[in-house]
Amino acid sequence: LDLEQFGKSLFIDGEIQVATSDEHLYSSTFVGSGLNLNRENERAAIIGGGDGGVARECISKKFNFIDWYELDPEVVEVCNKHLGDIGKKSTEKNSVKCVWGDAFESIKTVNEDTYDHIFVDLNDDQFCIDLAAKNMDSLVRILKPDGVITAQVGSQDKKPKQVDNWLNVFNKNFGNATL
């Protein structure tokens, strides 16, 4: 949909996922906040992020290798076709390897200590929190010792319970999670 206030927008199951008017703020902040904690940018993993904005930002930050785990290639195709400025055809870049299917199944075969950064760009609903919590051991296993996991946790003012749930998941595994 092309919304007057937000520009071209993607809706899935009646929920807005991304809008061209403010996507850059989201993706640049999302990737940049992790880089403020760890400047290493050799390898990144993206879990979700079908619109391509996080992949675009990882490319712009000169990550050498980006593994993008996305469940639904159709979402990426639709975004490339209708919201092309967001992902800038990130799937066609040599530094990006797309792994289609269940990300949490796919990462089970990844070597330990592989990624400097893991960007978890899933929906901000309880299902995704539970899914990430169930698979946090796998995420921690593939993260380098000084690596950083950055997650889309939702809005503190609109979904405070979900934000608290995410913080509990991270504090249980790391003990040092902050907003």
Feature-to-residue mapping (PLM):
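A short glycine/small-residue-enriched secondary-structure motif
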Residues: 9-10, 27
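Conserved S-adenosyl-L-methionine
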Residues: 175-179
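Short, isolated positions in well-ordered beta-strands
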Residues: 17-18
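Short strand-turn-strand beta-turns centered on an Asx-Gly dipeptide
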Residues: 12-14
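The AdoMet/dcAdoMet-binding core of the Class I SAM-like
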Residues: 21-173
